């Protein structure tokens, strides 16, 4: 269908790698819809040419920054300010209906059935389920809606300093009016939710259609071993509880995206791709040899407590589920 599209956004060359993997995963699962990507002037001309190979339409837009630095600081994610550029997706009136997907999402199955949904359809946010997560949503492009969103952005801003707060303010009836607009969680499976509700993931995770790599560390920031075809563990990263989704991301990246980047001179060759700052200062590593063992520094109980309170628990080490269970067992005996 030429009047419907999957839409994503990249504001720099680092996120463009995510967009390339997303687009490749949509094609891999044989979508019949067009693919469009919004880019900002910060995306290099060379990377834009690479995007044009995967996407049917590459559209440059001006950055609309919320400027809400206090809220962004509170969220510890100041880069989210520029994601208000997502509002431009409502101006794509050449399409009758679209599905927006963040560049840090990955498609695991055909999801063309999302176009049967109405605006605004989205999955609950794992942090506050009465709000929807704006990483995946169905919408209908409209100049009127676009202008109304700009007005809300200007007059009210965003309660979280990013696009999700603004969109939840605008579509404020999502939580209560129509359950049909609540997408199942499998259409926007948060990678950080896997650890927090492991039993549900074990029961339903096999049905996941889209995984969303929330958090500061993105798939392209990890180290990948081409021999084992697996991502190296990163200490207390909860995403590594079930790294299979990261491995799928990297498999698509190495087989479909790296050759494209090589074609445009963004990387020289696979063998020299270890520890190379290939695009816009963002490092993607391919570990071609032995992965050196790392020793974890000693952390006092007070430091551990402080890290817990800041949401930085060592999920893969001292604060793993098995270690917590052992500690609880000593008290219950």
From Swiss-Prot:
<feature type="binding site">
    <location>
        <position position="104"/>
    </location>
    <ligand>
        <name>UDP</name>
    </ligand>
</feature>
<feature type="binding site">
    <location>
        <position position="12"/>
    </location>
    <ligand>
        <name>UDP</name>
    </ligand>
</feature>
<dbReference type="Pfam" id="PF01501">
    <property type="entry name" value="Glyco_transf_8"/>
</dbReference>
<feature type="binding site">
    <location>
        <position position="164"/>
    </location>
    <ligand>
        <name>UDP-alpha-D-glucose</name>
    </ligand>
</feature>
<dbReference type="InterPro" id="IPR029044">
    <property type="entry name" value="Nucleotide-diphossugar_trans"/>
</dbReference>
<dbReference type="InterPro" id="IPR050587">
    <property type="entry name" value="GNT1/Glycosyltrans_8"/>
</dbReference>
<feature type="binding site">
    <location>
        <position position="160"/>
    </location>
    <ligand>
        <name>UDP-alpha-D-glucose</name>
    </ligand>
</feature>
<feature type="binding site">
    <location>
        <position position="104"/>
    </location>
    <ligand>
        <name>UDP-alpha-D-glucose</name>
    </ligand>
</feature>
<feature type="binding site">
    <location>
        <position position="11"/>
    </location>
    <ligand>
        <name>UDP</name>
    </ligand>
</feature>
<feature type="binding site">
    <location>
        <position position="104"/>
    </location>
    <ligand>
        <name>Mn(2+)</name>
    </ligand>
</feature>
<feature type="binding site">
    <location>
        <position position="86"/>
    </location>
    <ligand>
        <name>UDP-alpha-D-glucose</name>
    </ligand>
</feature>
<feature type="binding site">
    <location>
        <position position="9"/>
    </location>
    <ligand>
        <name>UDP-alpha-D-glucose</name>
    </ligand>
</feature>
<keyword id="KW-0597">Phosphoprotein</keyword>
<feature type="binding site">
    <location>
        <position position="9"/>
    </location>
    <ligand>
        <name>UDP</name>
    </ligand>
</feature>
<protein>
    <recommendedName>
        <fullName>Glycogenin-1</fullName>
        <ecNumber>2.4.1.186</ecNumber>
    </recommendedName>
</protein>
<keyword id="KW-0320">Glycogen biosynthesis</keyword>
<keyword id="KW-0325">Glycoprotein</keyword>
<feature type="binding site">
    <location>
        <position position="103"/>
    </location>
    <ligand>
        <name>UDP-alpha-D-glucose</name>
    </ligand>
</feature>
<keyword id="KW-0539">Nucleus</keyword>
<feature type="binding site">
    <location>
        <position position="15"/>
    </location>
    <ligand>
        <name>UDP-alpha-D-glucose</name>
    </ligand>
</feature>
<feature type="binding site">
    <location>
        <position position="12"/>
    </location>
    <ligand>
        <name>UDP-alpha-D-glucose</name>
    </ligand>
</feature>
<dbReference type="GO" id="GO:0005737">
    <property type="term" value="C:cytoplasm"/>
</dbReference>
<feature type="site" description="Important for catalytic activity">
    <location>
        <position position="86"/>
    </location>
</feature>
<keyword id="KW-0007">Acetylation</keyword>
<feature type="binding site">
    <location>
        <position position="215"/>
    </location>
    <ligand>
        <name>UDP-alpha-D-glucose</name>
    </ligand>
</feature>
<keyword id="KW-0479">Metal-binding</keyword>
<feature type="binding site">
    <location>
        <position position="15"/>
    </location>
    <ligand>
        <name>UDP</name>
    </ligand>
</feature>
<feature type="region of interest" description="Interaction with GYS1">
    <location>
        <begin position="284"/>
        <end position="316"/>
    </location>
</feature>
<feature type="glycosylation site" description="O-linked (Glc...) tyrosine">
    <location>
        <position position="195"/>
    </location>
</feature>
<feature type="binding site">
    <location>
        <position position="218"/>
    </location>
    <ligand>
        <name>UDP</name>
    </ligand>
</feature>
<feature type="binding site">
    <location>
        <position position="103"/>
    </location>
    <ligand>
        <name>UDP</name>
    </ligand>
</feature>
<feature type="binding site">
    <location>
        <position position="212"/>
    </location>
    <ligand>
        <name>Mn(2+)</name>
    </ligand>
</feature>
<comment type="pathway">
    <text>Glycan biosynthesis; glycogen biosynthesis.</text>
</comment>
<feature type="binding site">
    <location>
        <position position="215"/>
    </location>
    <ligand>
        <name>UDP</name>
    </ligand>
</feature>
<feature type="binding site">
    <location>
        <position position="102"/>
    </location>
    <ligand>
        <name>UDP</name>
    </ligand>
</feature>
<comment type="subunit">
    <text>Part of the GYS1-GYG1 complex, a heterooctamer composed of a tetramer of GYS1 and 2 dimers of GYG1, where each GYS1 protomer binds to one GYG1 subunit (via GYG1 C-terminus); the GYS1 tetramer may dissociate from GYG1 dimers to continue glycogen polymerization on its own. May also form a heterooctamer complex with GYS2 (via GYG1 C-terminus).</text>
</comment>
<feature type="binding site">
    <location>
        <position position="163"/>
    </location>
    <ligand>
        <name>UDP-alpha-D-glucose</name>
    </ligand>
</feature>
<feature type="binding site">
    <location>
        <position position="218"/>
    </location>
    <ligand>
        <name>UDP-alpha-D-glucose</name>
    </ligand>
</feature>
<keyword id="KW-0963">Cytoplasm</keyword>
<comment type="function">
    <text>Glycogenin participates in the glycogen biosynthetic process along with glycogen synthase and glycogen branching enzyme. It catalyzes the formation of a short alpha (1,4)-glucosyl chain covalently attached via a glucose 1-O-tyrosyl linkage to internal tyrosine residues and these chains act as primers for the elongation reaction catalyzed by glycogen synthase.</text>
</comment>
<comment type="similarity">
    <text>Belongs to the glycosyltransferase 8 family. Glycogenin subfamily.</text>
</comment>
<keyword id="KW-0808">Transferase</keyword>
């Amino acid at each position: 269908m030429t009047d419907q599209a999957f839409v994503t956004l990249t504001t720099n060359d680092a996120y463009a790698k995510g967009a390339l993997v997303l687009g490749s995963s949509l094609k891999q699962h044989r979508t019949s819809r067009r693919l469009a990507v919004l880019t900002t002037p910060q995306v290099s001309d060379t990377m834009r040419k690479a995007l044009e190979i995967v996407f049917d339409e590459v559209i440059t837009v001006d950055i609309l920054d919320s400027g809400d630095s206090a809220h962004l600081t509170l969220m510890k994610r100041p880069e989210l300010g520029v994601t208000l550029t997502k509002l431009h997706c409502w101006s794509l009136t050449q399409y009758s209906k679209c599905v927006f997907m963040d560049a840090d999402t990955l498609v695991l199955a055909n999801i063309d059935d999302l176009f049967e949904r109405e605006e605004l359809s989205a999955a609950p946010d794992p942090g506050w389920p009465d709000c929807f997560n704006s990483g995946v949503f169905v919408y209908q492009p409209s100049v009127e809606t676009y202008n109304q969103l700009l007005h809300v952005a200007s007059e009210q801003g965003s309660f979280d300093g990013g696009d999700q707060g603004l969109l939840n303010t605008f579509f404020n009836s999502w939580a209560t009016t129509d359950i049909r607009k609540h997408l199942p969680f499998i259409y926007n499976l948060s990678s950080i939710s896997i650890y927090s509700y492991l039993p549900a993931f074990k029961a339903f995770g096999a049905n996941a259609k889209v995984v969303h790599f929330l958090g500061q560390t993105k798939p392209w920031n990890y180290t990948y071993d081409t021999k084992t075809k697996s991502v190296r563990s990163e200490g207390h990263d909860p995403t590594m509880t079930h790294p299979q989704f990261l491995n799928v991301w990297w498999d698509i990246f190495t087989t479909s995206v790296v050759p494209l980047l090589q074609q445009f001179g963004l990387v020289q060759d696979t063998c020299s791709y270890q520890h190379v700052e290939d695009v816009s200062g963002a490092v993607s590593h391919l570990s071609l040899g032995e992965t050196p063992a790392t020793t974890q520094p000693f952390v006092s109980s007070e430091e551990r407590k402080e890290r817990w309170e800041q949401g930085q628990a060592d999920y893969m080490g001292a604060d793993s589920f098995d270690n917590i269970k052992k500690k609880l067992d000593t008290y219950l005996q």
